[in-house]
Design a protein with these regions (language model features):
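Conserved Radical SAM active-site core
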Residues: 1-4, 17, 35-100, 107-112
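A generic structural signal for alpha->beta connector loops
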Residues: 96, 118-119, 142
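P-loop/Walker A phosphate-binding loop and immediately adjacent motor/lid segment at beta-alpha junctions
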Residues: 77-83, 88-91, 132-158
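Conserved C-terminal portion of the radical SAM core fold
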Residues: 60-69, 93-94, 123-133, 154-158
Length: 158
């Protein structure tokens, strides 16, 4: 998996101060996407063990609330294995940090994916330019914030 951005301090993508990872690769290609440079799977740099160590060193700080994973599309088949491994590692070493994940896929499509075991909050749904709104965490009214409680059938949607 490649990534186009690893931000040590992010206050725009989830609550508090967070670390954010922007993965490369997206086949959805939403019209009006805020990040079209992320569509190419080869854009940016390869996510390596060194990248993981760097990301974890950022999460080590007490004032960091968690990790936000955006894209691109983190749940593309090419990205999903690395995203799962990353989330599993973060939850193992930082169980009190939250993981937020943005996806252009709907919650019904992703709710049973293995990665969802590690996600605390998902922002789900494709960006639809005709439904554009100004929201702090998503860009169109069809998208949802879903806070997961550990029981996929007991999630809280915003």
């Amino acid at each position: 998996m490649n990534y186009i951005g690893l931000n040590k301090y992010d206050t725009a993508n989830g609550p508090g101060i967070r670390v954010s990872l922007f993965v490369s690769g997206c086949t959805l290609r939403c019209k009006g996407c805020f990040n079209p440079e992320s569509w190419n799977f080869k854009a940016g740099k390869e996510f390596t063990d060194e990248t993981l160590k760097q990301l974890c060193s950022y999460l080590d700080k007490d004032y960091i609330q968690g990790l936000s994973i955006l894209g691109g599309e983190p749940l593309e088949p090419e990205n999903e294995p690395t995203v799962i491994a990353l989330c599993k590692t973060v939850k193992h070493f930082y169980p009190n940090k939250t993981i937020w994940l943005w996806t252009g896929k709907t919650y019904d499509i992703i709710k049973n994916l293995p990665v969802m075991e590690y996600i605390d909050t998902v922002v789900a749904g494709p960006y639809e330019q005709d439904l554009h709104i100004d929201h702090c965490y998503y860009g169109s009214s069809n998208q949802q914030i879903i806070h997961l409680t550990g029981n996929k059938n007991d999630s809280k949607k915003e």
